[in-house]
Amino acid sequence: MKKSLRMTEGSISKKIIFFAIPLFLGNLFQQLYNTADSLIVGNFLGSNALAAVSSSGNLIFLMVGFINGIAMGAGVVIARYYGAKKRDSLQKAIHTTVAFGLAAGAVLTVLGMFLAPKILVLMGTPADVLPESIIYFRTYFAGSMGVVMYNIFVGVLQSVGDGRHPLIYLIISSCVNVVLDIFFIAGLGMGVGSAALATAISQFVSAILCMVHLMRVEEEYRLELREIRFDSIMLKQIIQNGVPSGFQNSVIAIANVFVQSNINAFGKMAMAGCGSYSKIEGFAFLPVTCFTMALTTFVSQNLGAKQYDRAKKGARFGVLCSIIIAELIGVIIYAAAPVLIAAFNRDPDVVHYGVMQSRTIALFYCLLAFSHCIAAVLRGSGHASVPMIVMLCDWCLFRVSYITVAVRIIPDIRV
């Protein structure tokens, strides 16, 4: 039975929602196994270990985010050829994307292993947290090939409208991650590196499952191992669409690393508290993330099929839904912040910092939803450079300049 979803026909709202639902569930489970690290580490290994995991998070996103941005650009190219029903071009785009992922995963592994200590020191990671941060970071990047290839394969499946299989495989890998976390840390008494090891193993599991499915599917997007190679024309298109998205992710990550370095200056309790909030924010923003992913695929497929009016109507629907849902969630986070933060670590200082972070940001989720959805529409239409420039000005120039000045004038983490 055909599991992909053509966005070029049928009810616009139903197509977007039905595609977004498995994306939401998949991202929910992904957040669950990311959060499992923090919950288990925080409760079994203490605040130092939790701070180590938290301090590595933005740095990991910096290095992985660029690669994932390229994968997003590849997804736009694949979705457009799928919508246009150009099988040969679709095949070349898919196999070039996989070849790129293999090369990028190898480079990322080497860079992550060697650059970890220097970057963590530059971020101002406290001396008592630094050793565990390095262990977590290096262990994670030793398995970064699984992380990269999982995102590549999922990007291929989602670009042709298949959200069901990534969901199934992600549920399996999430269960593997949680079981391994408990076994390594609670059962064997292993340290913080075992949390990263559990995540890496689970990502490899999901990547392998996605790859096997793509090799077995009887569709025009079938993966053939012998066909994995670079096609210069496709690589150029992928880079043109992907580099702006990758750079955008890196800009956000660089700004977050800078913010993290300022958080580090407030001590390990602030690091743990703000790290706990970041996990909550990951859950809170899931609906918006799913609508942005669905919008990019919807717009790409419809533009490929030259259904321009349908693409516009879908974009308007997705943006409006995201804004409403995001603000409702923000209100809930604001009200329930103390209980949510305490789930990660009950230390009063950790909860204090986490609640401050939550209540400073939560009510502005609607603005984030609007900007992310507009960026998704622009990416889907092949104008990825526009959100890249906006993010560069907003997240990097304005945000970093503001923090540099504000923290020195008002030494309060809420600024």
Show where each model-derived region lies:
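Short alpha-helical transmembrane segments in multi-pass integral membrane proteins
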Residues: 1-20, 78-145, 187-243, 299-364, ...
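Residue-level signal for short hydrophobic patches within transmembrane helices
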Residues: 9, 13-32, 36, 59-66, ...
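Transmembrane helical elements of multi-pass membrane transporters/channels
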Residues: 18-37, 139, 150, 173, ...
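Helix-terminus/linker motif at the lipid-water interface of multi-pass membrane proteins
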Residues: 28, 32-51, 120-127, 183-190, ...
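Small-residue-rich hydrophobic transmembrane alpha-helices
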Residues: 50-110, 147-166, 260, 274-337, ...
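Transmembrane alpha-helical core residues of multi-pass small-molecule transporters
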Residues: 57-60, 104, 172-177, 198-206, ...
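Hydrophobic transmembrane alpha-helices of multi-pass small-molecule transporters
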Residues: 62-65, 109, 177-181, 207-211, ...
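Structural signal for membrane-spanning alpha-helices in multi-pass inner-membrane proteins
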Residues: 112, 155, 181, 185, ...
